[in-house]
Amino acid sequence: MPQSSLLGPLLFLLYINDIHKSSKEFTFYLFADDTSLTYANDNLRTLELTVNNELGKVSEWLHANKLTLNVKKSNYVIFRPRQKRIPFIPQIKIFNPTLNTRVILEMKDFVKYLGIMIDSELSWKHHIDFICHKISRSVGIIAKMRHYIPRHLLLNLYHALIAPYLNDGICAWGNCPQTYLNKLLVLQKHALRLIKYLFS
């Protein structure tokens, strides 16, 4: 199946649709070729043991279905309250078929999933910083274009370049601390003032 074909993603999803049967402990989230696994346990030692055991089962399922996990793109995050420290870093391992051995996955403070930056404390700081960076660039574009194109096209630019970042995943990050939301509000107001500037 060609990589960029229209049927490719659908057929791949059908092919891996029963991967969840490989483990009773994980919750699987599948989107196109992006798969995320979650597991919850208050005891870090139990978590380490269970996750390693279950990842072994997932690896066996992948091998049986002639699929290879991209170990370089695989990592994990431990979600926890800000005040709770991790007493040790769990060694989460997955089988690497290229090296024919188990390798330790990298623990991250945050991960990007479907365009949303999710950090270990669910503070959404990384995601807000990411959005602010993207919106700042778009505000710069509007600032340059405001003298050359009519207002309705500037509004189109706003809805194409800025609004999607403000709307995407807002159900997840929209309840973040007000100080983070204020950063977005300042940028949004700046963009709208630039659009209004022509007619003020």
Q: Which residues does each predicted region cover?
A:
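Hydrophobic packing residues in well-ordered alpha-helices of helical domains and bundles
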Residues: 28, 48-51, 55, 69, ...
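Active-site palm subdomain of RNA-directed nucleic acid polymerases
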Residues: 9-38
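Short, conserved micro-motifs composed of acidic
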Residues: 53, 68-109
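Structural signal for well-ordered, non-membrane alpha-helices
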Residues: 20, 56-63, 136-143, 163, ...
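Short, conserved non-catalytic motifs in the polymerase core
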Residues: 1-11, 38-44, 99-101, 107, ...
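Basic, alpha-helical interaction scaffolds
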Residues: 102-172
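Short, charged alpha-helical motifs in flexible N/C-terminal segments and linkers
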Residues: 59-78, 171, 180-200
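Catalytic palm subdomain of template-directed nucleic-acid polymerases
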Residues: 24, 36-60, 175
